Amino acid sequence: VASRGRAATPTLGKAMLNKYARAFFTRVLTPFAAFLIRRGVSPDTVTLIGTAGVMAGALVFYPQGEFFWGTVVITLFVFSDLVDGNMARQLGRSSRWGAFLDSTLDRVADGAIFGGFALWYAGGGDDLVLCAVSIFCLASGQVVSYTKARGESIGLPVAVNGLVERAERLVISLVAAGLAGMHAFGVPGIQYLLPVALWIVAVGSLVTLIQRVVTVRREAAEADAAAAAEENAEENAEQNAAQGSEAAK
């Protein structure tokens, strides 16, 4: 959550809401956040509970093919993204630890969601191709996030968003899963939305990974060239100064 010290990376809860809906839910959740603060609950606790709820929804319901109810549970706990940020603002806190915890648990939640899909297709869904696609979505999502974090850690801006980032990956997958789950209520043909969504996320994640790798390579080359030019300029300046001293003698 940005208010907890993290850079402006959209969390799942914020990604699922436009600015008007966010303003509405901020007003609604502010009293609840204040209540939790009075009870001595910390933003970190809310973050942990939210992640646990997402994991439960994904790893309990999805492997059984209960996509509708699993998505309902996940969506409810997703709003912890808004609650912990609201609490942090009320407390006036913006910590590196909070940013680190949020980012780390985001990866855990992502893994649980796509892991739940993979477990379903490896079991009751009986489709090893879609199981592999789900695992690819899980792995590629982690690597896409890592490329940006690693690039920034070595001083590069990584100035590219990419075709399908975390918010898009999760919104596409969860909306498709929720709708596909309505097949259990008699809606015909809608179960095919989830496989289509997983393929879209897989291809989009691969494109995004390539975009980020290419961007990091270009920025690294530019940074190395700039550093070399600066070093040459310093050497030339030193040589000119030395020659000037010799001439003065």
Region locations from a protein language model:
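Hydrophobic alpha-helical transmembrane segments
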Residues: R4-V72, V78, I113-K249
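Hydrophobic, well-structured mid-protein blocks that either form specific transmembrane helices
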Residues: T75, F79-D127
